[in-house]
Swiss-Prot record:
The keyword Nucleotidyltransferase does not apply. Ca(2+) binds at D158, N162, D166. Homotetramer. GO terms for molecular function: carbohydrate binding; metal ion binding. It comes from Robinia pseudoacacia (Black locust). Seed lectin. Mn(2+) binds at E156, D158, D166, H171. This is Seed agglutinin 1.
Amino acid sequence: MASYKFKTQNSFPLLLSISFFFLLLLNKVNSTGSLSFSFPKFAPNQPYLIFQRDALVTSTGVLQLTNVVNGVPPRRSIGRALYAAPFQIWDNTTGNVASFVTSFSFIIQAPNPATTADGLAFFLAPVDTQPGDLGGMLGIFKDGSYNKSNQIVAVEFDTFSNIHFDPKGRHMGINVNSIVSVKTVPWNWTNGEVANVFISYEASTKSLNASLVYPSLETSFIIHAIVDVKDVLPEWVRFGFSATTGIDTGYVQTNDVLSWSFESNLPGGNSVASVKNAGLSTYAA
């Protein structure tokens, strides 16, 4: 089975072991093209991020993707935050493709847990990417149709089931050029709980994997799909987060990212600037 959920006391240590092993593999690759950064928390006016629409960093160091007004999330909010430097996902000269790992923690909280909308996603898109539509489009896509020219890959954490393009119930999904996911797995969202996410892409197998863990609940959700990023994405991309609240009254939630790290290697690629420790130091990879 390509995607599944499991609940076990040993699941979180297992996922950490897998993550550590994959990071070791990345570090052993003989590569001149790499990108690495770590934001244990965020800083207001963060210079290494591009903010679009409603996204901002709060005074407490939280990346708040959608609006909160007087403590309440409003409807029809959309926000995105992208890593500022373009990222070379594949090399047109050599044909090599980058492997990468990214991890982040987020909280989604709703005033009414029965009426959540719409969701949060991690995505890769063309360098000049601009916000998509509200609501169910998650700020990434313009409409529900498949379009190869979108050149987008996303992992979504969807809290509202749109009858036209979603499975029934809250879910995680992998999206390729469409809001209609190529793979989904049911997701038991928990109101106000910290979720830890680990996403990896292995270039040699074209394997995109994502796991979400609620440490306090010892519950995990895992999804996997084969995605040829060289066929889907342009050579250079930007990547980051997008989130939306619902269109209808009452269908709202917060979409807050607490921390974020990323590491990649592209054999024979170009060197790019990287940051560590929330921008306190920079280096050329």
